[in-house]
Every structure is written in C-alpha cells, then in structure tokens.
Amino acid sequence: MVKRQRIESSNVPLSAFAVRQLTLSKAARKKDNSSGKKRSVSEEESQDKYEDEMKTEGEFPSYKHTLVQVVVPGVDHRTKLHSESSKNDSEITPDINRSKVNPQEYSEFSVASPQTISPSLPLNLDDETVSENVPHSPQSSNDAIPVIKITEENSFRVKDTLYVGLHKDQKLAMVGTFIFRSVRGKFQLFGATYSSACMSWFPLNAPLAFATPVFSAIDNALPAMQISEYEEDSLNLRSFAVPSYSPKEHEYELEPKDILPNFETVIAFRENENGLSKIARVLPFAKRLFSFKNLLQDASSISNNFEITPESWCSFSNQLLFSTSKSDYVVPRLMVCGPKGSGKSSFSRYITNRLLQQYRHIAYLDLDPGQPEVVPSGHISLYYINSPLQGPVFARMLFPTYMLRLHLGDISPQKDPDHYIACVTRLFAEYKDYIFNQEISQKEIIPLIINCPGWIRGGGAELLSSIVDICQPTEVVYMSREDMKSSHREKKSIYQHKEYMPDFLSSRDEFQLTLLESTWQYLPDPNVNKVTSADNRMLGLLSYLYFNCNLQRWDFTTSLTACQPIATAFKGSSKGIDAVNIIGEPLNVNDVAKTINGTLMALYACDTASLDNSNTQRIVSSPEGIPLIINDGLPLDPNTSHCLGLIVLRTIDLKRNEFHFVGPLNLELIKDAYAKSLKIVLERGRLELPVYAMLDHRLAQYSELPYLDRNHDRVAVGAHRRRVRRNIIRRSTFVG
C-alpha cells in the first residue's frame, strides 16, 4: 500500500489542532537544544534549502514569515488580508500542490487573551509581527475614533473620584462599572448630551466584548436644549442615590473652576460596585466581560471596539430635531426596521438619546421579542423613559415611568403571528389613549420610537406591513448591512446573504422612508469579540433574575436555589394564583405539575370577566389540585391581561398546596392587581430556563440535582448546544 503524502502550504488554512502540534514540536526542539543536542542542519542552511525548493518547484519568491490561518467552523476565511499583514508578503498565492512548509520555520508564539485575536484573520506566528497584525488599540485598528489616554496632565484623583479633562472634540473611552457626571462643560455619550448644570450622577456599566462608550467633549456655547436643563426630580435617578458632592470633596474644598483649569470639559468618575462584575460566578463565559482589575479603567489600550456613530445617523437626527422645532411640526412616530444584525436596536437607542434633548419623555414601543431593550426576551412592551439608554441591555438598570408588557413566550413571532399582531394592536392602543389624555390636558405630546423585529422575509414582510398599518408611522428608517461608502475596505461578516428590503416600504407614500447604514462595517473585524444573540438573551435573562429590587443591585453571590422564595397558595379560599395557562401543544391534565415545575413562567394579571365568561376556555383541576386553563394551548388575551414579570417556579408544595417561586417581582404591582379585583395567572411559554440558572454553585455533587444531567465522562448525542438551520434549500426547489 502506498502511503499518502501530506501536502502543506503556507496559505492553506490549518486547524487549531495543527497549529498547536507545530507549536509543541517547536517547544520540544528548543528543549532538546538547551540540553546539549546539536541540530543536524542549521537554521541558515534550512532557510536556504527551503528557499531553493520554493524557487525550483514553484518559482515563487520565498516567504520571510509563515502565515497560519486558524480555521473556525462557520466563518468565511476568504477575506482579504489586512494591509499591514501583507506588506512583506507576495501578491501571488503559491499553488497548493507545489509549495511546502518547513515546520522548523515556525517560531513560538503566545496569545495573551482570546479577545485580541480574530479567528477569521490570518495570524503570523512570529512574535514581532503578531503585535502588528492584531489590533490591540483603537489607534491602530480604528482611526475613526482617536481616543485619548489618561495621563497625569489630563487627570486628577481625589480619593474615590477621578477627574479627567478634555479639550473640544477630544474623546475618552472607559470600561467598567462606574458613575459619572459633568463637572465643567458639556459632553456627549452616544447621542445624549450631559452638562455641568445637572449635579446628579449617572450610572454606566461598560463590559468588554461590547461596544465601548466614548465620551466626546463638545462646544459649551451650543444653544441646544440639554438633558440637564430638566428638573432633577423628573430624571430617573432612583437606582443610584449618590449625593452631588461627597464629604471627601468638601474636605478638600474643591470648586469646579479649580479642577484642571486648562480644560474646557471636566468629567468626574467613581467606581460603582453594583454586583454586575460578579456575573461570571453563575455564567462562566461572561468572565471575559469584566476581565480587568479595577471597576473603572481606561479603555484606550484594552479595547478595539468603540461605539461609532455614522455620519448618516447624525445628519438624520439633526434633521429630525430641526423639524420638531418648527411651529407646525408633527410629533414623529419613527419606525426602525431592517434585517437581523443591522443595528436596529443601536440606532433606536441613539435616536432616543437625541430626542431626549428636546422632550422630557420618549415613548418606546419595543416589538422585537428576541432582543428587547428593557424586559427579558420573549416579551414586547411599551414604556415611557426620561433618561438615556446607555450600555448593553443586560448591564442596564432602567426603571421606566410607565410600562406595559405582554408575554409572547417565544423569541420570534413566527409560531403565532396572529397573537403577535393582537399584542401590537393592544400596545399601540395604549399609546393612543395616552396621547388623547395629553391633548385634553394640553400637555406635551411625546414622540414614539418603534423597534421592529429582524424577520423581514416571507411572513415577516407581511407582519411588518401589518405593523405599519397599525402604528401609522411618519418616518420609517430601514437599516442596511450593505457598505454605503466605497472607501471602506472589504469585510466579511456572519451575514453573507443578499440584502433584501420589502417592496411595500418604497411604494407607500404615507411616510418618509430613509435608508441608513449599520455600524458593523466600521469595526476592525465584525467577527472579533462577537457576542451571539443566544448569549445576549442568556445574559439578559440571568441579569433580570439575579437583580435585587429592594437593594437596587445585582446579587450573583446567592444562587436562585438559596434565595428566599415567595410562597402563595393555588388552592383554597386564600389562594394567590387563580389559574395556570400553558402555551403550545395540548397537554394532559395529569402532567401539569411535571410540566411547570422548575420552569420559567410569566406572572399575569387578567380581567375577571375574561376568565369567567369565556366560551373558548375553561378551568379544570389537575390531580394535584392545580387549576389549569383549557384553551387549546393558546396564550392569554392581550386585550384583557398584562404581564407583571417573569418568575422561576422553584417548587410545588403539594402538602400545603403552594407555589414557591423566585424572581425580581414588583410587589406593588401585585397589590394593585388585587385591589382592582384582577386574577393572577401563571403562563408557561416556550422560553427555556438556562442551565446556569439551575445550578447551585455551593454544591460539589451535581448528580443529585434535579432536572440537570452533567456527565463529564461521556457526552451523549444531542447534548451540545442546539443549532437550527433555516438556510437549507431542498431539491424540490430546483424541480421545474
């Protein structure tokens, strides 16, 4: 039998296992050299021999540095090499069948952090060139955001407060969990403008692997209305009750004019230990989010992903604000739509922050159940906010002045579009009632921001058309993933399919259509530090479940199994839960207790008449006495019910006929529901409780934990993360 010869090439993508084998072999050779062994051929002779082979066999120029590309499944490696990494390389690609690689040419290399390496870019194994090809700082990777570094000349620290001075148009990037305010001058942060006239502190949680916030100093003479001109009582500052000046500041008798007097803008920072940095205790992969020593740190040297505001966003928002300043203006109803991953949520957050300069409140209609801004996934909601939206969703403490949310029980409206449209109709009707009351009271009418889901093909286009008919927007913004500027270098991302926009958006004339660009194309590499949608949803859900409403902070040190539960009866005269509803396929009544125990459920407040006088549903009791609504697996009517929050049904006490559940519930809402004689219903949807929420990290033995199977020795088929493919084309499609 003839042995198969292995053909190697400097441009052939190698797997991570091959790279590791080459590195280990090089380390072994160095160890042998240190023990006194002599090499048969010197490095110079090997290099000359290798160059001769390359010239003889392929007539290609020799390569000084050997490039190895780490192959990651699902990532397109056909991208063009970065200009810096291709300066010393030939433009001609050697033939895969004619070129060889000498393993001795590989040198040792070490990766400092997985956050600084892109799996889609070729890595040079030479130590000196790794720092050149891999962007470690924004100055080398992203010239559009020239952030400054904190030095002794532009900063001043007094105990727990850090003061940083900025000149006009200078930018500062910070990461961590901290609070900030303007001591002198004005600055902008992702569309929101802060002024020294407001003495309150604002919280910000800026983890790594997300867009780093950028503080930009602006001209103090700008005659624009700022957020700080409103009364401080109207701002949403309940979650961080911090005095304007600490006793330590009074001790040093600091005056704003005496702090860094050579700078027009001075920003004060303080560390804010709110417990979020300890999220890695319950979610291991979140360790890289806060992988820095201090809770307040300069991001100029540790981040290469900054919050970028394209020029098209700025011009659109300026035009919108200018139109609202006219006497005959119409209060805008802005709908933001586009495909998945196009930056709809980012732009909605940006335009909301800009509009807060002109309005005291903004109505936000969040119709994306997969990536909501305030509530966990699986909900759509309407809320009124009066403070800027800063930071990632899971790291945001936001308490709207009013909120109405409805539970879909799924991250997509695809399985029940009729119920989704009914929920949208209910939420928009609530906004219309509010506007009507404002007009009667002759008060300010607030604008509406509508964030749509990313499902825009097929049935998604029909849903989007229905949303337009219901909400009647005055402005429609379509977010495009296509590069609108040819000056940007070509980039490959996880979104490779052709751009698609529904035809009805351009054919209808009752609104103004605007196409805006996404921000992913401005990043050094869209695939670097990418947090998937599933991980985002898990972060948001765990952040929600571990939030302590009484202390206004996160508590990841206590497991959900160790938290004191809320106990309420489901049977008897003093019952607190009137019924249980299960969305999905019809269920046998005997299996109710097993189906809902240890699951994620929504707490609903329903109108009494909707349950008593309904012809399509009835309430029966299970063998355990649990009241179950029989309505063919349909959700509750959104016109007569609303969601109070998410809970984890931890235990069903059959002896006392009680439900024990945990979750950040607002007990005042439950008390108000009882006062209005509303019935409390638990609804089980299709949302899955993460495995990390079931674990009790205090225990060492996982085999005895219920509902959890952790077998480290053998992994069964199907035990990995579930992945659904929706891009499979059947053969029947090609049959004429």
UniProtKB/Swiss-Prot annotation:
Residue ranges, compositional bias (Basic and acidic residues): 47-58, 81-90
GO BP, one annotated term: cleavage in ITS2 between 5.8S rRNA and LSU-rRNA of tricistronic rRNA transcript (SSU-rRNA, 5.8S rRNA, LSU-rRNA)
GO molecular function per UniProt: ATP binding; polynucleotide 5'-hydroxyl-kinase activity
UniProt signal peptide: none
Domain of life: Eukaryota
Primary localization: nucleus
Presence of the UniProt keyword Transcription regulation in the record: yes
Keyword terms of this UniProt record: ATP-binding, Chromosome, Kinase, Nucleotide-binding, Nucleus, rRNA processing, Transcription, Transcription regulation, Transferase
Subunit structure, interactors included: Interacts with crb3, rix1 and Las1.
Name of the protein in its database record: Polynucleotide 5'-hydroxyl-kinase grc3
